[in-house]
Regions:
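Small-molecule-sensing regulatory modules
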Residues: 55, 60-184
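N-terminal segment of the mature folded domain
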Residues: 1-13, 91, 96
């Protein structure tokens, strides 16, 4: 099976194995604007997201803004943004990019710590299916596997699930080859 890894439980069910972790796509959250960036300075700006993690980080940075709940698939969330009085909505960059619908004026929210394993695809299979495990190893990206393993261990230690307002990012600093970690 193929999954968005951020939605996979940190402890896999008995009999299920992680067969491969694909190279991470863009892990950033992005802001899709309704109009211009002028709303950032407005005390009552309104942003939409369905994520408690995004809401908490947004309000920490912009405490006078309002955050409204936004649910549904990517296309329905974009449609809701277009049909409401919101100033923008926060999305996972990888989701929009995989669908080829990232707006050109979307803003990378590099300050926002993503969900653990955001932007990562995982392949799972039965733990006794050696043929599938061997075949999928060609897809496995070791660096991504290590980094998301750290992020998911952080999530597990905090006893959080995919809906908990927990952010985590592990990455390899290319100059030093050291793993850096940010968690919130």
């Amino acid at each position: 099976a193929v999954h968005s890894m951020k939605d996979v439980p940190t402890v896999l069910p008995q009999g299920i194995a992680q067969a491969a972790v694909l190279k991470r796509a863009n892990y950033n959250d992005i802001l899709v604007l309704k109009g211009t960036e002028e709303f950032f300075g407005q005390p009552n700006a309104m942003i939409a997201t369905g994520s408690l993690r995004r809401k908490a980080q947004w309000l920490n940075r912009y405490p006078t803004h309002k955050v409204v709940d936004l649910r549904g698939n990517v296309n329905s969330r974009l449609e809701k943004l277009a049909n409401n009085e919101w100033d923008g909505a926060v999305f996972a960059a990888a989701g929009l990019e995989r669908l080829g619908i990232r707006p050109a004026d979307a803003i990378n929210l590099g300050w926002m710590i993503p969900a653990p394993a955001q932007g990562v695809i995982m392949v799972s299979c039965r733990d006794n299916d050696a043929e599938i495990i061997e075949a999928t190893q060609k897809l496995n990206d070791y660096e991504t596997q290590v980094c998301v393993g750290i992020e998911r261990e952080f999530l597990n230690l905090l006893e959080g699930g995919c809906t908990a307002p927990i952010g985590a990012l592990a990455y390899v600093e290319q100059k030093t080859q050291e793993i850096n970690f940010k968690g919130i």
